[in-house]
């Protein structure tokens, strides 16, 4: 089949090359310029970059749906997914250039990936059941939450935590010291060879790429893994920082403050709720304003300053509105009568009178309930907002649902959708509001002021992020959320992978071992799978298997080489590939490849002194999340193979290759969804 006809694969490869500089700890930032608004932002996020690419084509939409689905599920790993889409698109094109049938490419590549996933599970690092979070030493680390009292005397927002300024863009390549983190106990090796010889063959290939692909995990039970002992949250956070060390320090401080509030000295998946971690961005302010605080920190119009001063320190009655406070806000099931036309003598005045009437009723409801503070998920009518300000009632708009839920749990307020639902159960008590100040001055950003809202037993932490360069604000917020979710996934799963290319290197070695196998059982396995097919199909599967697996491995070759170059260890990809070949030889000569990789990457330096990055005399292992990494591989390969099949059907105007693989007499079970 002519490779030039596979336009879809070529488009994937073209779009994926834009994220090469985003791999590794030393990322090269990209400016994104909006030709309509003439504004620009600075980003190192493949997810943000995708939002600004031309995705009008069918291939672009498929790529967008795949990455959007992955980002929605994990909030991390999108760069790996994006990069591997390009790497495996190139690998598939090479297979087509060799004249390999599409059906064999799909079958062997999926088998190879599943085999690798089963094999690398042995390289997992198991966290202890409870990771000590050092919360007992919070005050010595700079966190001071004693300013919050039950009476609502919160003090200045800038005093809760010692300032942890984020570096400027020019200093983003500076990393802090990396002490040795984990002590391990080697366990017996569990190899992945002959992984699927006792299993039925299942080939899943879905075009519904926006669905969660976790059910594709067709691997054996997880083997025993290395255990982390005597480890603190500090070491785990540094291993997952991936070059975002200052931002990860902020995440670590937020988690410690959270543990202190719930009075826990240890951290596990039940005590760290990622939905109770919020951010507040202050573009244009110095990095000294960056801090972590207890409660909900947000921005409100400067007109509310007098109201907040009046309410400061007083226990407030709070209302939570899970909707909008506007006259036009209607129930989702409300429809205007069909074929009915409303005619008024003075249409403009009538509309104005209707809005005035609604504002009067809404204002009366609020006054009757004696409400001081209203948190609204949506927008608020400006006229109602002004009336409430005159009555010293504070209204905060655009409040996320998880924040409403947090205040509902601690104040007893039940969220309402409309003001007509207000009753004695829907109003909460004991909420407090204060102005955030620095050096006795109110913090003001773009005609808005910073406030903090707290309550007794409120399970909510806010990270206030600031930068003098407004264009970097989105990037800093993305980095914070990425680090937070990495730590969240690690604690939820209780396992991490060694990073820095460790599992990719093990996958390459495993695939090379599969290629080199020539035992009778290997060929018997092939013949058993294709016994119902023609001898040509059987011979082709055996003949092309090595080439297909080799192309699959080249995707990980590309990943590791770009990663090593971006880490500053090598000046060119050729030098990085030479290093990879040497490492593969060392692995092959070792009696236990997994033990070799574990030993090497548990003490491997992440940075290079020649790049001007300060490192300590000790090293810290780099870690990757387990499920986000594996799902990124799965989604990437499934997207590439979907495009491959679609291209093949367009070129040949036939789907005969599917009919062969879906034969009812076949011993293997192939599912094309």
From Swiss-Prot:
GO terms for cellular component: cilium. One of its GO terms (molecular function) is ATP binding. The keyword Transmembrane does not apply. Signal peptide: none annotated. Its main location: other. The keyword rRNA-binding does not apply. GO terms for biological process: chaperone-mediated protein complex assembly; photoreceptor cell maintenance. Keywords: Cell projection, Cilium. InterPro entries: BBS12, Cpn60/GroEL/TCP-1, GroEL-like_apical_dom_sf, GROEL-like_equatorial_sf, TCP-1-like_intermed_sf. Gene3D superfamilies: GroEL (3.50.7.10), GroEL-like equatorial domain (1.10.560.10), TCP-1-like chaperonin intermediate domain (3.30.260.10). It is found in: Cell projection, Cilium. Component of the chaperonin-containing T-complex (TRiC), a molecular chaperone complex that assists the folding of proteins upon ATP hydrolysis. Belongs to the TCP-1 chaperonin family. BBS12 subfamily. Component of the chaperonin-containing T-complex (TRiC), a heterooligomeric complex of about 850 to 900 kDa that forms two stacked rings, 12 to 16 nm in diameter. This is Chaperonin-containing T-complex member BBS12.
